[in-house]
Amino acid sequence: MDSLDLLRTAAGGMDAQRAALDVLARNVAASQAAGPKGSYERLIPQFAIGGDGESQVVFAGAVAQKDDGGGILAEMVSVLNASRAYEANASVFEIGKHLAERTIDMGRL
């Protein structure tokens, strides 16, 4: 895997986690709007392996699930997990960018 593949993979992971965060934000809003006795259909982000033969994670949509009683706490835990995964992909992207820059610098010597 060269540094450009690393950048593509990390960017794909960031795109997937951003889409998951959008779904989770809708869940938080829906759980607050449902009221104490109303239930809402929670959307669960789904991921798949994508790309052209390379290992790349893509957002594959969301599947509806009846509220299991976890409510806002479960949603916030999911938001934290998705946020941390996004940050991890952003860190990998920065490392890949640094490696690409160093490779270009070495080629100039």
Regions found by a protein language model. Give the residues of each.
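Amphipathic alpha-helical polymerization modules
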Residues: M1-L109
